[in-house]
Amino acid sequence: MSEMQTTRRGRPGYDQQGILAVAVAAFNEHGYDATSIGMLAERLGLSKSAIYHHFGSKDEMLDRALDSALGGLEAVVDAPLPDGAETTDAVARLEHVLRGAVHVLVDQLPAVTLLLRVRGNTDVERRALTRRRAFDRRITALVAEAQTEGSLRSDIDAAVVARLTFGMINSIVEWYRPGGREGADRLADDVVAIALDGLRHP
């Protein structure tokens, strides 16, 4: 999956990455539908044609931002456990995914915020929602596997566990501010403690 990386350069100081960052901030502030190319041009101090040099449409900007957020989350699920991990059972993999997801949210806070506000109003948004649902199913399957192994209590439905856990993780976008008291590592520890300690079999 691609990340929000610069692929073309135009005027100094206004590369693709910089334009996309401003666009995502505007989408989050005003809503995607209410944000026009003209508004972005004014914020950037560029002409509309200069923006179109980098992006063919506003939809392309949205697609790039959502792909960055989703790609980061999908990569966490696909990533192997670190070398030297004590176990590769399902609950260890689930913990690895939860920690990784927290880091993705912190590292890509604006893009993930945008993803969580998608409602399926455009083809781009509908594709993103399809990928997000597929991600949710993978998390549910991992929870169910950990329950089958006996690592997690099984009296709570796996889908409910997945939704509640990621509801907590996703809430980070509403209150987290970079440079605060807790960094990504500490937040990940907190999430794992709250989400898994009450679910583990003694």
Question: Which residue ranges define each predicted feature?
Answer:
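Short hydrophobic/aromatic patch on the recognition helix
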Residues: 44-55
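Generic detection of well-ordered alpha-helical segments
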Residues: 13, 17, 21, 25, ...
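Amphipathic alpha-helical packing segments from all-alpha helical-bundle domains
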Residues: 71-78, 103, 107, 124-149, ...
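Hydrophobic alpha-helical segments that form the core
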Residues: 93, 97, 102, 154-174, ...
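Amphipathic C-terminal alpha-helical segment
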Residues: 103-107, 114, 136, 141, ...
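Hydrophobic alpha-helical connector segments
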Residues: 64, 75-107, 162-165
